[in-house]
């Protein structure tokens, strides 16, 4: 478990952020699991149908956090913040952004099926904005901006192939998994 530094009974923000980076490896496992889900959705859309791709992403999305915890456990790593940690509440709030915005994505996709992935990319980008504070990593701002800008660009200028957004998002998440891991590892003293 991460070491929690307390000052006068209150945790410093930087210490709380470091705990999040260390516990979740800078988002490594979560980004990796998410990348796999997005690429599986892209594959389902590319080689079967958009409808199957949508189902894979929506249903798979509900399993991202439990699978992330499983991957962390499998790596012999802590898989959750300690009970009472100040970032637990923010993490829970951030986790609900995507499921609560799914009706919007489904409504948009009902009118413009090719906008399913771009709409979800934009919402995923917004979902990552609080990660900047929670992890104390500006890199999540870059990921967020790339997802939002790409989602808008694909919706407006490149709606075909329909699966492009899924493949691009999977690729970005995969790359940022290793960016986050590197940032988290740089926090660990090498002595």
Regions found by a protein language model. Name each.
Residues 1-23:
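Short, Lys/Arg-rich, polar N-terminal cytosolic tail immediately upstream
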Residues 34-38, 94-105, 144-149:
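Core segments of transmembrane alpha-helices
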Residues 35-89, 95:
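Selected alpha-helical membrane-embedding segments in polytopic membrane proteins
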Residues 42-55, 106-115, 155-163:
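Helix-coil boundary and interhelical linker segments in multi-pass alpha-helical membrane proteins
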Residues 140-191:
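Terminal transmembrane helical module of multi-pass membrane proteins
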């Amino acid at each position: 478990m991460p070491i929690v530094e307390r000052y006068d009974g209150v945790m410093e923000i930087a210490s709380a952020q470091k705990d999040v980076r260390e516990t979740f490896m800078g988002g490594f496992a979560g980004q990796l699991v998410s990348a796999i889900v997005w690429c599986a959705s892209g594959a389902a859309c590319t080689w079967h149908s958009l409808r199957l791709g949508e189902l894979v992403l929506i249903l798979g999305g509900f399993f991202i956090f439990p699978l992330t915890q499983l991957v962390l456990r499998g790596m012999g790593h802590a898989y959750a913040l300690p009970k009472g940690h100040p970032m637990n509440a923010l993490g829970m709030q951030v986790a609900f952004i995507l499921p609560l915005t799914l009706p919007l994505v489904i409504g948009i996709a009902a009118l413009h099926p090719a906008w399913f992935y771009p709409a979800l990319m934009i919402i995923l980008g917004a979902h990552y904005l609080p990660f900047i504070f929670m992890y104390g990593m500006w890199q999540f701002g870059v990921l967020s901006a790339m997802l939002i800008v790409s989602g808008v660009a694909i919706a407006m200028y490149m709606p075909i192939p329909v699966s492009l957004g899924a493949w691009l998002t999977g690729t970005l998440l995969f790359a940022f998994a290793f960016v986050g891991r590197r940032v988290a590892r740089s926090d660990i003293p090498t002595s």
